[in-house]
């Protein structure tokens, strides 16, 4: 392990930031050879939001494995009570802005969700159109409405736990 660490040192976002900024400005063949489809932004809970370049092949791999892994995680941990039901995936597909060169910037999951929209009805309670709603409160209401109608609701998930907490607080607030 020490040899590996010596030859491949650990890095962090700061080490790549100037390259990512160049990519955001439209420069190609930096860090990746494919075109950047979109930049996912982090939640910013640990500081300034970071941009993560997403390519077609990276998005396909991430979407495929995230969907499979999340379903498998739920099954492995709740198999005695698993009902093979859908889950409430609190996510959106709203593009928040664009880079100077016109590349979309959205939450890290938005770009991937757009590309798997055909699978969404089989895995999640909310239709894809709910994920397109820009008003966060309206979107939370709709996600909850569809989830509460699902008799075999198996799980509630989101990429960011803070979104699940917001959703549950919203439910408590509006329960009456």
Region spans (language model):
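Active-site phosphate/ATP/adenylate-binding loop shared across adenylate-forming ligases
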Residues: 2-176
